[in-house]
Every structure is written in C-alpha cells, then in structure tokens.
C-alpha cells in the first residue's frame, strides 16, 4: 500500500527532522485504497490526537513512520495491534518530538484488510486518551 520509492525520497529529510510520517489522508489516495468509513475514522482519530496531545496529527493511523535511531531508542511501547501508531504518536508527543508529515501516495491493498474498522478505531481512541492521561499523571505526581 505504501510506495517504496516515496519512502526513499523522504530519507534526506531526516537530516533536519527526527521524525517523518507518511500522510495518506492528504494524498494522493488511489481509488479503492480506503473506504469512506476508514477515511472519516482516520480523520476523526487524527483530530482527537491533535487535540489531546496538543501537536499536529495529520494522519495518526499511518503505517509509514521513519525516525532517527536516537528517537527510536527513547520509545517505550507496548502495543501489539493497530493502536501501535497511536502509541507511537503519543510517545513522541510526550518526548517533544512533533512529527513532520510528508504527503505520500497510498495504494489499494492487495488481499484482505486486517483492520476491523469500529473495534480497532475504539482501541486506537482508547490508546490516545490513556497515554495522555498516564503522561499527565507522571507530570503532576
């Protein structure tokens, strides 16, 4: 679904930006790459992530993340499913690393989708909120 050549093109940006994330929602989206429910759900979750973590989340559910090794080594993650991207975003926001969003093409998936829209959306939403609450508790204790 992600074009490898698009990823190669963004690598030089790592010199100035420690975290790059592919923004599928600002396109271009290939026809049939994402249905309306998933598109709207991604927009909603990204808006929630932006509000809760107070940093821009153009496409919080993107699976295309590129970051410097020094940033990766500071991450503490425990997610196993589709909420991993939300946890990545929340952890980076807590570390003060606002992602740089790079528009990338997104193609239609070959084969069956693994995502269950509503259930995974709820898990992602929960992860975004829980990580923010936990971070706030650490700060105020």
Stretch-by-stretch model annotation:
Residues 10, 88, 128:
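Aromatic/hydrophobic pocket-lining residues that form π-stacking "cages" and hydrophobic walls in ligand
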């Amino acid at each position: 679904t992600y074009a490898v050549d698009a990823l190669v093109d963004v690598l030089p940006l790592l010199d100035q930006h420690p975290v790059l994330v592919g923004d599928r929602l600002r396109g271009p989206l290939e026809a049939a790459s994402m249905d309306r429910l998933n598109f709207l759900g991604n927009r909603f979750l990204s808006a929630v992530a932006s509000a809760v973590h107070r940093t821009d989340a153009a496409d919080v559910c993107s699976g295309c993340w590129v970051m410097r090794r020094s940033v990766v080594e500071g991450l503490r993650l425990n997610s196993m499913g589709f909420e991993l991207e939300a946890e990545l975003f929340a952890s980076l926001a807590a570390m003060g690393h606002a992602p740089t969003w790079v528009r990338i093409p997104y193609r239609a998936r070959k084969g069956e989708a693994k995502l269950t829209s509503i259930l995974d959306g709820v898990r992602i939403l929960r992860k975004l909120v829980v990580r923010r609450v936990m971070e706030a508790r650490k700060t105020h204790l």
